[in-house]
């Protein structure tokens, strides 16, 4: 709906009517915490509600939306040990596996590494590694946005941009990066103080694998159901040193894919 210009006035009025009563209720409200995925600029949604403090990229609150390694070790030691036992792994190897799969979020810089709490807690509850957060929703809108504006796929993990771009979204913009970042598929990897630029990338393997697997059928002639199998076959052929098998599969894979898209996927 956001990318459909004719619907913006409707969206603006709905959101403004939802938030504006908070201003009138100010004498009765001691603390209000607003959270969501996206803040849109130039929509005048918060015109009347002008006493909001945006802490999205404030360093003191960097870990407020996740679990740090220190917090996990201090408060979830028993869960880690039971999960390690169920996987027949050492505690140290279990921590490394959890970090690789679910850690790596940064909402500002500097920032501690933050685990995705939803995936971490589900892993402890089910005693099984899985893509729990990614499976709660699919990035269909993001992929459509990338295709609509011909965003180069190979640049998705090597993005350099500024803080204001990350902190709000211009509804008229053709850049999908702010939406992808604010939706949790990209995170801050580094910061250049001289130019005040942030480097973005995938936070962890759950997000990277999930996003690329979902992206693949939209850019190549492979169905969503077959893409995990194709990736597994590619990896297996590389590990076995089966060069002929790999090249044959690659040729078949890109037979019906436009040259520009094939080049983008190869760069990944």
Language-model-derived ranges and their functions:
Residues 8-30:
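Substrate-engagement module of ASCE P-loop NTPases
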